[in-house]
From Swiss-Prot:
Summary of subunit composition and partner proteins: Homohexamer.
Domain Sm: 9-68
Taxon lineage: Bacteria, Pseudomonadati, Pseudomonadota, Gammaproteobacteria, Pseudomonadales
Protein name: RNA-binding protein Hfq
Role according to the record: RNA chaperone that binds small regulatory RNA (sRNAs) and mRNAs to facilitate mRNA translational regulation in response to envelope stress, environmental stress and changes in metabolite concentrations. Also binds with high specificity to tRNAs.
Gene giving rise to this polypeptide: hfq
Keywords, comma-separated and alphabetical: RNA-binding, Stress response
Length: 84
């Protein structure tokens, strides 16, 4: 995993799992709102009244509608050991 994804993926995944409403600002200034349905290396699926595929290279900023807590390395170890 590249260094850039070590923060991006857990952040987007937390927003997705907790169904946090987000505002996504594009580089051209357009504001999109909805919930993150899914994402991969290149795109984010944003769901509102319709689903939109937003290319990450077009995104300037992702703003959550409420504060989110990112999982730490210790949290990941605890959840893995809890599955034994």
């Amino acid at each position: 995993m590249s260094k850039g994804h070590s923060l991006q993926d857990p952040y987007l995944n937390t927003l997705r799992k907790e169904r946090v409403p987000v505002s996504i600002y594009l580089v051209n200034g357009i504001k999109l709102q909805g919930q993150i349905e899914s994402f991969d290396q290149f795109v984010i699926l944003l769901k509102n009244t319709v689903s939109q595929m937003v290319y990450k290279h077009a995104i300037s900023t992702v703003v959550p509608g409420r504060p989110v807590r990112l999982p730490t390395a210790g949290d990941a170890e605890q959840s893995e050991s809890g599955n034994d």
